[in-house]
Amino acid sequence: MSISETPHNKSQGLQKAAGRPKIVVPEGSPSRNSDSGSFTIEGDTSLNDDLLSISGSVTPRARRSSRLSLDSITPRRSFDSRTLSVANSRSFGFENETHSGSMDFSPLGNNSIYEIVMNTRRKNWLNYPTVADIPQVSLSKNDLDDHWKTHVIEYVKNIKSDYQIFQSTNNIRNMNQMEQLKELREGENMHEESFEANLRQGDAELINSIPDFYFSDKFQLDNPRTFHKVLDAIDLFLTKLDMKRQAERDEAFSELRDRLNDFLDIVETLLVTEISKSSHKFFHALSEVDNIQKRALDTMSELKELAQNIKTIDAENIRKKISHLEMIFKRKNVEKLEQGLLQAKLVLNKTDECKSMYEENKLDNCLELIKSIDYLIKGDDSINEDVQSWTRCWPYKLSNLRTIPALSATREFLTNMKIEIGGKFSLQLSILLIDDLRSFCKSIKPKETLHRIQTGSNDKKQTIFTDNFSSKITELIVRLNRCEELTSAFDLYREKSITELKSIIKIYLPTENAHADNNHDEKHLNNGSTSGSKLSRLIKEQTPAEFQSMLVNIFTHALEALRRLYGHQKLLLDISLNELASVKSPNENQHNMITQLDIRTGINEIIRIIQLRTGKIIAVRRELNLSLRYDYFLKFYAICVIFIQECEVLSGEFLTKYLSNVLASQIKHYANAQSSKNYRNIKKKIDAEEWIPYIVDSSIQSDVNDIVSSIDIDPLSWTTILDMVGGSHDCENGRSEDKEKDEGNETYQGHRKSVVVGDKTFVASSSLLATIEVIKELMVLSINLPSIYLSNFEKLCYDALQYYNSSAMASVTQPGNSLLKTGRNLSIMGESLDCLAEFVIIVQRFYQRLSNSNRDFEPFDASHYTTLLGQFQASSNKIYMANAPPPPV
């Protein structure tokens, strides 16, 4: 690399093309006329170009003349005429300071002020270019495809490593010259050490004369600090570009150029010296390369021949070893086949042994042996100890014989045997649980059950089991789990329990005696009647007390059985889950059958069946129940409600509405039937009434007192009717005792023939007492039956009172609305009407109180009762006027 000495033409030199610096050497420079030829440097400086310039000239002066001036680095004007030239014309060099000398341009000489001001030399320098200036060039068509950017990017990536190597070796600024010189000197012989030491000392002095920042990796000339270091206190007068400073500027340029050329000469000289020292080694290495290549070819041919020989030998050895291995494998396969036959024979022998155990009823040993045979068929000896002891001396692993068709019959036989054993265990479990269920139900009497339910006590007897019973259940569940029949055993018990609960109803159904059976059998055989009609007839022939007793026995027995079944459910579920959790290697079906171990679904099915069947039994006596006395009907209602509620408590859900619907239908029909029955009773009593004072029993007066007190509170004797344990019996016993006491004291107290209602006393009649009994029954039914029927019973009370008034007056009234002269004491009738008028007010206030506690009940309007009181008052006045004495004269 060289820098031109002449800084005159500043515009020539560094040109900017595509953003990179470009150094152009003019044609007229001495370097182009030198022997080394001309060269152009673009971009970064090249080491090879520097060597070329050094080799073309020996003297430093000649090399200095070939270098460009720093004037080329300075910025130039856009239209400087010194940079313009035409094709094939001679470019003016940096040192060409002469002109043509013609006086046509300036009479004052070259470069005169006149020439500069008038611009006589280059008047037409800004003319348009011609064909001579710019020759015609045929532009090529751009045939780039659409993906040219992708191709360029890929190409740049491919040459990136090569470019980095080139840049690191071709840029002198990125090289550490001292390290390269040191590496070159390490290869010299020992006899040149003294000469090299002296030369190294001289080279070091030359290198030390160059400032260190030129060898820095971060050398950047565009950095102001670096640029000032390069100038080294040389003033180029760049801020004053006038002609007055031109001479000083030229001297500064020359000084800077000379200094830089000296630095370059030092580096080039050292590089050429070091390279020339190693040139003979390079040629020696080239001569040895040919020899190495020849030897490498010979070695490759020998290696190929050796590889072929080794391949032949290996193939022969491999064939022998393969043949040997095939014989070994064949022998092992034969041994495995023999062991498999022994395994199959052992399976058959153990199966026969298992069959004999089953015939001897050794079920546990048989089940254990079946399990071991199953492992033997699977070829698994890792778990079962029996299989390990049977095959301890066998050399090979057991085979899986499950896919062998010859053993399919044996496997099926073992499976069936396991199922039969599980069936026996299941039957034992069901029998044990059913016996416990029966003994539990027998140990509890119906009264105890009713007392427990009505008092709300929970003795938890259903969950108490003896240790012996629990241990037996545990043993059976363990056996069932071993034979994988646990779920089927629970299903069997579920079916057995349903059958057992069905039989409870059959136990308490009515039956005929032997004599009656013969007569009725002959009659029914002739008529072709079915057993169902016979049972219906027997149910209808029962007395109310017998029917009630049958329902109580069925319901209490069934409830205790259901309680015990829920205890069985908890016990079985706890033991089963513990057994499943204790198994070390659970079966694949054990996790899926946990939900199948709960017998709750069977218990719920039992509840549905019992309610359905008892509902049908009750429906058979639907017509007969309409004529029941009110206390028997309430007992019937109470036991049905108790059973329905207890079933709901036990199951936790309302399973069926059948029994509830049957009971609701019975209540509705019973309430509707009360109207005609009451009319008949009242009509019968009035028709037979003689209107004479009637003896009032103490029980009747007690009922009247209860009716009066019902305005404020429910009488105790009315609410205890629903007590199934014995409250109503105590009440009846008390009444009979009072009656006997009154009869015993009759001779001393006389006959009581009046009814006391509050603070009023009325002479009693037979029809009055019968009507009071009707009113009492309706009020008792109103308190104890659901509130939805209150409106019906209020209407019945209202109609009964109204009907008594109309019937009584009709019995003593002529067609002309005048009273008959029958000779009977009509004042007794008036007393009865006045007494019932008091009951009208009591009935009104009674149902008004019930409406306050029952939002779904709306009582009669007060106007209805006012009208009824008016009717009673009119009848009483009419009777009074008929019996009044004539007025005095």
UniProtKB/Swiss-Prot annotation:
Topological type in the membrane: Peripheral membrane protein
Keywords for the protein's UniProt record, in alphabetical order: Coiled coil, Endosome, Golgi apparatus, Membrane, Mitochondrion, Phosphoprotein, Protein transport, Transport
GO terms under biological process: ascospore wall assembly; Golgi to vacuole transport; intracellular sphingolipid homeostasis; protein targeting to vacuole; retrograde transport, endosome to Golgi
InterPro entries: Vps54 (IPR039745)
GO cellular component, one term: cytosol
Bias (Polar residues): 1-14, 30-44
GO terms assigned for molecular function: syntaxin binding
Region (Disordered): 1-44, 729-748
Subcellular location: Golgi apparatus, trans-Golgi network membrane; Endosome membrane; Mitochondrion membrane
Keyword Mitochondrion: yes
Further remarks about this protein from its record: Present with 2540 molecules/cell in log phase SD medium.
Role description: Involved in retrograde transport from early and late endosomes to late Golgi by linking the vesicle through the t-SNARE TGL1 to the Golgi, leading to the membrane fusion between late Golgi and endosomal vesicles. Also seems to be involved in protein transport from Golgi to the plasma membrane and is required for the integrity of the actin cytoskeleton.
Name of the molecule in the record: Vacuolar protein sorting-associated protein 54
